[in-house]
From Swiss-Prot:
This is Thiamine-phosphate synthase. It catalyses: 2-[(2R,5Z)-2-carboxy-4-methylthiazol-5(2H)-ylidene]ethyl phosphate + 4-amino-2-methyl-5-(diphosphooxymethyl)pyrimidine + 2 H(+) = thiamine phosphate + CO2 + diphosphate; 2-(2-carboxy-4-methylthiazol-5-yl)ethyl phosphate + 4-amino-2-methyl-5-(diphosphooxymethyl)pyrimidine + 2 H(+) = thiamine phosphate + CO2 + diphosphate; 4-methyl-5-(2-phosphooxyethyl)-thiazole + 4-amino-2-methyl-5-(diphosphooxymethyl)pyrimidine + H(+) = thiamine phosphate + diphosphate. Transmembrane segments: none annotated. Pathway: Cofactor biosynthesis; thiamine diphosphate biosynthesis; thiamine phosphate from 4-amino-2-methyl-5-diphosphomethylpyrimidine and 4-methyl-5-(2-phosphoethyl)-thiazole: step 1/1. Belongs to the thiamine-phosphate synthase family. The gene is thiE. Mg(2+) binds at D70, D89. GO terms for biological process: thiamine biosynthetic process; thiamine diphosphate biosynthetic process. Binds 1 Mg(2+) ion per subunit. Its cofactor is Mg(2+). It comes from Escherichia coli O1:K1 / APEC.
Length: 211
């Protein structure tokens, strides 16, 4: 049974764009998205703090679920909705501090062993990836594909799950059909010829998430 040690999130988080700027956060909130992640990589805390503060304020204004990738100290300091961590970040992070601050926690996984590690932390949701080949970031693992994704979703039947990695508009319906509760997208929106149209179409497929 789903019993996270961190505050719970809706079972279905719906469309979950992962973006690297406050400008994209504001655009997508205005377009109706209600679950988002600010992912800025390889900068010092003091370099990203203003962006984190602005993103959190926007999330509050729209009553959205805004996760901060990696910068957990800033997320705690400015009371974000939640934090998302990769496997490589778990050991170096004070999970008890995140939990004590009342923030939700999402954790990335790439195989059964990493799912075991994530489950031990009892986060708010588990991300499953990468489903398809992706150019967004360098991945040491092979794509899982839909069959493997469906197996993981079945294993985590009582847990909020998020599929990520190479999910395009064309692939999104098949991903949702596995039963996963959310699809995280990057280039499907940010590199679309018409990002507003792409966002609207993806919202039709994945929804805005449960209340």
């Amino acid at each position: 049974m789903y019993q996270p040690e961190f505050p719970p999130v809706p079972f279905r988080l719906g469309l979950y764009p992962v973006v690297d700027s406050v400008q994209w956060i504001e655009r997508l909130l205005d377009a109706g998205v209600r679950t988002l992640q600010l992912r800025i990589k390889d900068r010092r805390d003091e370099e990203v703090e203003a962006d984190v503060v602005a993103a959190i304020a926007l999330g509050r204004r729209y009553n959205a679920r805004l996760f901060i990738n990696d910068y957990w100290r800033l997320a705690i300091k400015h009371q974000a909705y939640g934090v998302h961590l990769g496997q490589e970040d778990l050991q170096a992070t004070d999970l008890s501090a995140i939990r004590a601050a009342g923030l939700r926690l999402g954790v990335s996984t790439h195989d059964d062993m990493e799912i075991d590690v994530a489950l031990a932390a009892r986060p708010s949701y588990i991300a499953l990836g990468h489903v398809f080949p992706t150019q967004t970031k360098q991945m040491p693992s092979a794509p899982q594909g839909l069959e493997q994704l469906a197996r993981h979703v079945e294993r985590l039947a009582d847990y909020p799950t998020v599929a990520i990695g190479g999910i395009s508009l064309a692939r999104a319906p098949a991903v949702i059909a596995t039963g996963v509760g959310s699809i995280a997208v990057v280039s499907a929106i940010t590199q679309a010829a018409d990002w507003r149209l792409a966002t609207a179409q993806l919202l039709e497929i994945a929804g805005v998430g449960d209340e």
